[in-house]
A protein has these predicted regions:
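An N-terminal structural lobe/cap that precedes and organizes the functional/catalytic core
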Residues: 1-15
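Conserved NTP/Mg2+-binding pocket subregion across the NTase superfamily
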Residues: 11-121
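Residue-level marker of positions within ordered structural domains that often coincide
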Residues: 36, 138, 201
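Extended, basic/helix-rich recognition subdomains
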Residues: 105-169
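Structured mid-to-C-terminal alpha-helical surface segments
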Residues: 144-205
Length: 205
């Protein structure tokens, strides 16, 4: 069995990943590593061994690597993998991993939105937080997981008129058809976050 260290995995991943909007050959890569014994039998929260993403590029280049942690987000990631995945080797995710109970999936959604309470919690990452809330709203309502642009379009049809321009702007910026200026829309963003969180909390209760 080949054993690879976090530095080896993350530095190798950097070579085939590029920051969002870079326009290069590679797309932004996200990688999550779990040990099957830590997620089967399923428990909440489960342990994540390693995670790679472009938001960690600076830390990785400086030699800082996240340790293994208990991560509520694995309930969402494994649900997504079981719904939409392609196995490159071995059995499918739907047979390799156990289903995540609905109550744990809902708790993971609730625990995720709990981190966004004040402007400082999303400052500099406004677009991603707005789109993440759209995905969570969609998932809380349907039990399914959709791409950010699909979830944003779905949510825009259910928003009061005053919040639609922001979600449409975030979606367009994500798709690359418009510039991302959400950092300049401080009050709009805060109002959307408050409204989306309150709506999601009502659905999950």
């Amino acid at each position: 069995m080949i054993s690879l260290s976090p530095p080896t995995i993350c530095n190798s991943a950097l070579k085939v990943s590029s920051p969002p909007g870079d326009g290069g050959t590679w797309r932004p890569l996200e990688l999550t590593v779990v040990a099957r014994s830590e997620v089967v039998p399923w428990r909440y929260p489960a342990r994540r061994e390693l995670q790679f993403g472009e938001w960690l590029r600076h830390d990785i280049l400086s030699g800082t690597f996240e340790p293994a942690v208990l991560d509520h987000d694995l309930a969402i990631l494994l649900t997504k993998a079981r719904q939409h995945s392609l196995a490159l080797l071995g059995p499918s995710a739907a047979t390799f991993f156990e289903p995540v109970p609905k109550e744990h999936f809902s708790k993971a959604l609730f625990d995720t939105i709990a981190q966004w309470n004040a402007e400082s919690d999303w400052k500099g990452d406004e677009r991603n937080v707005v789109l993440a809330l759209a995905r969570i709203w969609y998932s809380a309502s349907t039990g399914l997981i959709a791409p950010k642009d699909v979830a944003a379009a779905w949510v825009s049809e259910r928003l009061p008129a005053e919040h639609r321009p922001l979600i449409c702007k975030a979606r367009a910026a994500y798709l690359g058809s418009e510039d991302d200026d959400l950092a300049m829309r401080v009050e709009e963003t805060a109002a959307f976050v408050r409204y989306a969180k309150a709506t999601i909390e009502r659905i999950l209760r």
